[in-house]
């Protein structure tokens, strides 16, 4: 009887932990979906930023697929809590069969400060997101988001890019980047 009572008490103590984990997972899924929808629904894209450099490449992998990478580096201003997310080939959230590449969203927070790095504090020289594709060319809608030092202002820039064997090309529907 004492063993049964001990097991019941132990189980009742573990159940709230499971509920908290489920709540955390739901919150992270909602955050991911919100960013996914923001990227997918953006209608205004720029071709370059005044605040950092974007570059990219796509390479063939031995199994016949392709791996692509988008690199953000060379910050011109202090950028805190940077988030990057790409959505491949205009795939709707409900149709996505894989996680889209992102950094700073569901993982650690990263900051970029010109001419400084401190990996212990997550101050980095650059960020990379990468993904896999069955095709030699991939079209990405990309969001780059960051905050100022006080974290009281947030900035977002959207890009529509194509990666292929020739490198990265930027598509824009704006006449200027202002």
Give residue spans per PLM region.
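C-terminal motif of bacterial Sec signal peptides marking the signal peptidase cleavage site
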Residues: 14-17
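Hydrophobic residues positioned within well-ordered beta-strands of beta-sheet architectures
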Residues: 54, 66-68, 140-142, 157-159
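A structural detector for beta-sheet-dominated domains
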Residues: 69-73, 83-85, 143-145, 162-164, ...
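Short beta-strand elements
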Residues: 153-178
């Amino acid at each position: 009887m004492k063993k049964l009572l001990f097991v019941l008490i132990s189980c009742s103590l573990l159940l709230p932990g499971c509920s908290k984990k489920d709540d955390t997972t739901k919150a992270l899924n909602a955050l991911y979906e919100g960013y996914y929808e923001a990227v997918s629904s953006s209608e205004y894209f720029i071709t370059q930023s005044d605040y950092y450099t974007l570059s990219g490449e796509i390479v063939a992998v031995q199994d016949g697929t392709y791996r692509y990478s988008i690199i953000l580096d060379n910050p011109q201003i202090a950028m805190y809590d940077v988030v990057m997310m790409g959505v491949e080939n205009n795939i709707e959230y409900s149709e996505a069969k894989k996680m889209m590449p992102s950094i700073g969203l569901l993982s650690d927070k990263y900051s970029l400060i010109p001419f400084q790095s401190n990996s212990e504090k997550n101050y980095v020289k650059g960020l990379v997101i990468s993904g896999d594709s069955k095709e030699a060319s991939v079209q990405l809608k990309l969001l780059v988001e960051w905050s100022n030092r006080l974290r009281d202002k947030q900035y977002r820039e959207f890009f529509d890019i194509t990666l292929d064997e020739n490198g990265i090309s930027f598509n824009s529907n704006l006449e200027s980047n202002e």
